[in-house]
Amino acid sequence: MASGLIGRLVGTKPSKLATAARLIPARWTSTGAEAETKASSGGGRGSNLKTFQIYRWNPDNPGKPELQNYQIDLKDCGPMVLDALIKIKNEMDPSLTFRRSCREGICGSCAMNIDGCNGLACLTKIQDEASETTITPLPHMFVIKDLVVDMTNFYNQYKSIEPWLKRKTPASVPAKEILQSKKDRAKLDGMYECILCACCSTSCPSYWWNPESYLGPAALLHANRWISDSRDEYTKERLEAIDDEFKLYRCHTILNCARACPKGLNPGKQITHIKQLQR
């Protein structure tokens, strides 16, 4: 259904997802139990060592989550945060669990919080000037294991807006393409590019406090994408379906969503457009 679904789950079994889910605390600190693991090249002459503090929680041994330190030589690592995670998993700690797939900012699988900002690990460069980088799961989501969060509610909200073309007029010729002008096609720019990574929704305070009732920036952006599509004939019904004080109007245009989007989209702008159509 969504591009993020193709991201493979590294190091855990899908059958344990539902039972292993746990909510990541809004605020927490590492404990004295955190371990420090050094690369074999650590301390070597001419090395450029950097510490990565990574959120760890294992459903098979439940307890308080902690930050675990890993030190790697940046001279022996790719430039992106995902490169560091893959290096840690392949060479230092195979138990580290995270999602990833395309490595090109297309699938949205590797969304996580890096130094306090949501983003894609494959598009986030390692900051050379900082001695440490802290990596945690997307905030206010149920954690399955380590950096893997449960996306079930997020995808259900996306599904609820019926993200597909709906027609009332039967096609004159079966399977015939429904055309639209270049001008109408251009109206979809800034919406169709969404990769459903959830960086925007999990950066939104309104979504944090109303995750079951507020649809969130991503789902509402897609709602406007179909509301704005000249080929769709259910505009009125789509607007009525989300005309709700919680589904739509929990958005207070804080615009954390726009700042977090790795594709440079502005969900807040699209939500404002929906509100204007509701008047």
UniProtKB/Swiss-Prot annotation:
The record lists [2Fe-2S] cluster as bound by 102, 107, 122
Q: Which GO terms describe its biological process?
A: mitochondrial electron transport, succinate to ubiquinone; tricarboxylic acid cycle
The entry lists its GO molecular-function terms as: 2 iron, 2 sulfur cluster binding; 3 iron, 4 sulfur cluster binding; 4 iron, 4 sulfur cluster binding; electron transfer activity; succinate dehydrogenase (quinone) activity; succinate dehydrogenase activity; zinc ion binding
| Catalysis: reaction(s) | a quinone + succinate = fumarate + a quinol
Residues making up the signal peptide according to the UniProt record: none
Membrane topology of this protein: Peripheral membrane protein
- Principal localisation: mitochondrion
Q: Which residues form the 2Fe-2S ferredoxin-type domain?
A: 52-141
Q: Which domain of life is it from?
A: Eukaryota
Pathway assigned in UniProt: Carbohydrate metabolism; tricarboxylic acid cycle; fumarate from succinate (eukaryal route): step 1/1
For this UniProt record, give its keywords in alphabetical order, as a comma-separated list: 2Fe-2S, 3Fe-4S, 4Fe-4S, Electron transport, Iron, Iron-sulfur, Membrane, Metal-binding, Mitochondrion, Mitochondrion inner membrane, Oxidoreductase, Transit peptide, Transport, Tricarboxylic acid cycle
Where along the sequence do coiled-coil regions lie?
none
Residues that bind a ubiquinone: 209
Q: In which tissues is it expressed?
A: Ubiquitous. Preferentially expressed in flowers and inflorescences.
For this chain, the family text in UniProt reads: Belongs to the succinate dehydrogenase/fumarate reductase iron-sulfur protein family.
Subunit structure, as described in the record: Component of complex II composed of eight subunits in plants: four classical SDH subunits SDH1, SDH2, SDH3 and SDH4 (a flavoprotein (FP), an iron-sulfur protein (IP), and a cytochrome b composed of a large and a small subunit.), as well as four subunits unknown in mitochondria from bacteria and heterotrophic eukaryotes.
Q: In UniProt terms, what function does this protein have? A: Iron-sulfur protein (IP) subunit of succinate dehydrogenase (SDH) that is involved in complex II of the mitochondrial electron transport chain and is responsible for transferring electrons from succinate to ubiquinone (coenzyme Q).
What's this protein's name?
A: Succinate dehydrogenase [ubiquinone] iron-sulfur subunit 1, mitochondrial
Q: Which organism is it from?
A: Arabidopsis thaliana (Mouse-ear cress)
